[in-house]
Amino acid sequence: MTVDVKKVINHKIKPIEYNLTRKDVALYAISLGCGKKHLKFVYEGSDNFSALPTLGVIFPGQMIVDVISEGIDGIEFDPMMLLHGEQELEILNEIPVEGVFVTESKITNLYDKGKGALLILQCITSEKSSGKPIFKNIFSFFIRGIGGFGGDRGPNEKPIQIPKDRAPDAISKQATSEDQAVIYRLAGGDLNPLHIDPEMSKIGGFEVPILHGLCTYGIASRGVLEHFCDNDPSRLKSIKTRFTKHVYPGETIETEMWKINPTTILFQSKTNRDGSYVLSSGVAIIEPIKKGSL
């Protein structure tokens, strides 16, 4: 199979608009397990109603579906061979709880990993009325079976080293419901049938429909927000992780967190199924507590 890296990187992606409502903000929080104990995230009438920072991952959703279904110049692949490898979200400005947003996207790199290819997609989401950028997403997708085309292997980044000489500074446990993926697919905008249709999940090699990786990502970020940001969304500046294994709805996600310095939190997440880690090499950058704020 011929791969033309230049054509892939030059592939044009149309900007997309997203009309965000307060209801969307609340529903997204509910899809990550928030409830009546978290009114600032689920009740639009709350005086300090706020969006969870990882709301930023939902805006490029439809664009990604369109790109995968319509195809990418310079490369051919079976969408079933595409895996979401890593996710990085940077919060650039204060998050509005409603309004029209525009997401502009581009493919920045395609790396040859031998057994597959690593596609890097960058998305900038801005508030339409002001033009102010709010979120920057970097999606890393591994496409199985199309490597070996002689391309650049990409940077040799070493995995984040989680401290082994001390226990986590905080542990967050979040039980998911058996219907978690049913809710998240509507709130998070990922309508992939793999997460709801038993027949499609079997084709994908899973016993039952699996939970969205970005739902697990959002749940882990809630742990960081609660334990190190006092549930203040404005203090979470970026969060990045690697997806290492799937989660089945109904399992409990346990996120272990270490504070490395005033602004850096390392984390990893596992489930109660067999103790395997489902998120690894997690890094969150936070704003430290200002002196005199306590």
From Swiss-Prot:
Keywords from the named record: Lyase, Peroxisome
UniProt catalytic activity: a (3R)-3-hydroxyacyl-CoA = a (2E)-enoyl-CoA + H2O
Pfam families the record matches: MaoC_dehydratas, MFE-2_hydrat-2_N
Enzyme Commission number: 4.2.1.119
GO cellular component annotations of the record: peroxisome; phagocytic vesicle
Gene3D superfamilies with a match to the protein in the record: Hotdog Thioesterase (3.10.129.10)
GO MF term (any one): 3-hydroxyacyl-CoA dehydrogenase activity
Example of a GO biological process term: fatty acid beta-oxidation
Main location: other
Listed CDD domains: HDE_HSD (cd03448)
Domain spans labelled MaoC-like: 165-269
Transmembrane segments: none
Localization annotation: Peroxisome
Binding site for (3R)-3-hydroxydecanoyl-CoA: H84, G85, K113, D190, L191, N192, P193, L194, H195, G213, F243
Top-level division of the source organism's lineage: Eukaryota
Short sequence motif Microbody targeting signal: positions: 292-294
Keyword DNA-binding: no
SUPFAM superfamilies: Thioesterase/thiol ester dehydrase-isomerase
PANTHER family in the record: PEROXISOMAL MULTIFUNCTIONAL ENZYME TYPE 2, PEROXISOMAL MULTIFUNCTIONAL ENZYME TYPE 2-RELATED
Protein family (similarity comment): Belongs to the short-chain dehydrogenases/reductases (SDR) family.
Protein name: Probable enoyl-CoA hydratase 2
Species whose genome carries this gene: Dictyostelium discoideum (Social amoeba)
Gene name tied to this protein: mfeB
